[in-house]
């Protein structure tokens, strides 16, 4: 699919900011500053001809209005010397806006040379992709939306980049990429929802005002927890010991002996290789195929019940699903045949907002990364129930005290190395957005046809989102409409994966037929 850029613009808040503002980001926000958050939404043609003609103008204008509630997203990150409560100066990553020199949002419009259907699952036209319960596997290789999100390096001039791409059929896509220090995926979705409602009120005056919680940009709310458990100076050692006893990802966990990175990652200065990084076996895995697996409610419950039979009640649905797929990927890549010298790791991102009693609308990246590991000959490598239980128990160790210890440790840590560097090998990163409804982002009275995380060429990542709801009023964390899982895998391993009897809920015959052609 050919995508041609038609315009590049700078978008600022519609209301002028009268005085410059600057805030130091929280330590955990800064920890994520070498990464990015990227999401994409695909929409059908607007219902009315006038809406199609005014589409780009309306999107740009409503974005400018939405930025009035998120003016910092038009600002710039920089390091500044800050004086803390102890009167000791420390360089902190600050976000500054309202200066008159704000870079604004990097706003790109583009045109695609294909209909939007080319990027959607072929349901209704290829029955071989579905089973009787509604679960299906979709090979989206070559249709993974790579050209729809801004190929602009962050940490250069802009912290927020947006691309609107129109298609031959009149449909369009919206993609947002932000520096991860400024916004995790939860924050990006909140921003997109506010933009959506601003747009709907602008183009249809009679639309009732739908209530969305106001964004909260207050980095200090997270930082206050990093010292919550400190009663005196002697407690810092205890906190660090507690933090280091947790399986939280830290830069000093990287293996020694970094090797060359594959050219296809096309790394910009956004990513920093750092010291002693374990690159893994990118060279072996080769070009990636991209997949989406849709799990129906019926199959989610079957997998969950199966896990509970093996491991008891201490298993969540998400832990059961990710362990089910992760073990299948391990078998497909034959990691379980490497023996005790080759640990297999699953890194898991988790939001600490709710664990600390903070609102979901808190902007930034209050996200920790923990991990589960085992060797290929461990019994757990043969049981998705036991593994699901391990995942559930690992996440359960992070109570308020443990999260505070991990946050305190981060105050003296280097920024996290991007997953683009250290994933691959026998490591996998799992992220879930099931708590944030990506499909509640409506433009021109129409919801998205497809919503997805925008990663490509990243064979070590698994992303999970809640599927499009048939009933918009459903609670965000129900599974009535199923869930969608996105991941990428090399061709050789893909053939083994979809030949695995354990994945019989997905009729892989159509996919295997594609490999033979």
UniProtKB/Swiss-Prot annotation:
Coiled coil: none annotated. One of its GO terms (molecular function) is transferase activity. Keywords: Transferase, Virulence. It comes from the Eukaryota. Transmembrane segments: none annotated. The active site is at 180 (proton acceptor). Pathway: Mycotoxin biosynthesis. InterPro entries: CAT-like_dom_sf. Its EC number is 2.3.1.-. Gene clusters encoding host-selective toxins (HSTs) are localized on conditionally dispensable chromosomes (CDCs), also called supernumerary chromosomes, where they are present in multiple copies. The CDCs are not essential for saprophytic growth but controls host-selective pathogenicity. Acyltransferase; part of the gene clusters that mediate the biosynthesis of the host-selective toxins (HSTs) AF-toxins responsible for Alternaria black spot of strawberry disease by the strawberry pathotype. AF-toxin I and III are valine derivatives of 2,3-dyhydroxy-isovaleric acid and 2-hydroxy-isovaleric acid respectively, while AF II is an isoleucine derivative of 2-hydroxy-valeric acid. These derivatives are bound to a 9,10-epoxy-8-hydroxy-9-methyl-decatrienoic acid (EDA) moiety. Belongs to the plant acyltransferase family. This is Acyltransferase AFT15-1. It comes from Alternaria alternata.
